[in-house]
């Protein structure tokens, strides 16, 4: 699409009319289409960084309100599911971003408009663009519009991270993970537990929770996240 492309249809899908459309244009600009110096500044990469954090904040608030009985470990797993690359790429497709991407000739010919990693990055960049143009409330409305259905009906069942970690260790010929208590703090009526999980030859991971079980799950999640392992089934 040319730079004079009328973005009215896209803005209608997003539910936001830009006061400064340059934010939207930048969010759709891949590094391959930028020439000269400071290419990373004039592509969506900085917006992607901001959008990742804005998206995480809004989705965290949504989860906190939607699941009042959920403990922090479950909320963290749900958050990871909702902001993972595949989910963001699906949102980008729902937004209809592909045809609007500004790509270099090589990327355009290689099918980049359908590439999951690029679509996921652009979805986050668009969140940031709306945030910069209309503030947190506008960004929240955008996230609500495209992520709410995924929050209420998760596409993938969530798995216990302790089970996933044990399977991961077994597949690598390692013994079962060992969980050890590190610290107990707080009053008796609201204790906090810090737990570490150990596997031979690997750095331990620590996490806190309101119970030992919650802390163990959080520690397992932290370990898996560090190793790049996803805890949802179907991977």
Curated annotation (Swiss-Prot):
Belongs to the ribonuclease III family. It is found in: Cytoplasm. The gene is rnc. CDD domains: DSRM_RNAse_III_family, RIBOc. Its EC number is 3.1.26.3. One of its GO terms (biological process) is mRNA processing. Digests double-stranded RNA. Involved in the processing of primary rRNA transcript to yield the immediate precursors to the large and small rRNAs (23S and 16S). Processes some mRNAs, and tRNAs when they are encoded in the rRNA operon. Processes pre-crRNA and tracrRNA of type II CRISPR loci if present in the organism. GO terms for cellular component: cytoplasm. InterPro entries: dsRBD_dom, RNase_III, RNase_III_dom, RNase_III_sf. Residues 160-229 form the DRBM domain. Mg(2+) binds at residues 48, 121, 124. The keyword Disulfide bond does not apply. The keyword Cytoplasm applies. Its cofactor is Mg(2+). Residues 7-135 form the RNase III domain. Homodimer. GO terms for molecular function: double-stranded RNA binding; metal ion binding; ribonuclease III activity; rRNA binding. Its main location: cytoplasm. The active site is at 52, 124. This is Ribonuclease 3.
């Amino acid at each position: 699409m040319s730079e004079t492309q009328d973005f009215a249809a896209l803005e209608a899908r997003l539910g936001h009319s830009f006061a400064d459309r340059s934010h939207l244009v930048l969010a759709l600009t891949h590094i391959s289409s930028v020439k000269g110096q400071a290419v990373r500044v004039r592509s969506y990469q900085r917006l992607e960084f901001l959008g990742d954090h804005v998206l995480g904040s809004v989705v965290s608030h949504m989860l906190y309100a939607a699941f009042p009985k959920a403990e922090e470990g479950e909320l963290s797993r749900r958050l990871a599911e909702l902001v993972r690359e595949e989910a963001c790429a699906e949102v980008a497709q729902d937004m209809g971003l592909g045809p609007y991407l500004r790509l270099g000739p090589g990327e355009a010919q290689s099918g980049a408009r359908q590439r999951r990693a690029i679509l996921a990055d652009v979805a986050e960049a668009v969140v940031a663009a709306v945030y910069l143009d209309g503030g947190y409330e506008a960004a929240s409305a955008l996230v609500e519009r495209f992520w709410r259905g995924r929050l209420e009906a998760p596409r993938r069942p969530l798995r216990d991270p302790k089970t996933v970690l044990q399977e991961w260790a077994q597949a690598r010929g390692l013994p079962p993970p060992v969980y050890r208590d590190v610290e107990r703090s707080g009053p008796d009526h609201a204790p906090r537990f810090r737990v570490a999980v150990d596997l031979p030859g690997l750095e331990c991971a620590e996490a806190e929770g309101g119970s030992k079980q919650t802390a163990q799950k959080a520690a397992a999640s932290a370990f898996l996240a560090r190793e790049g392992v996803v805890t949802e089934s179907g991977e």
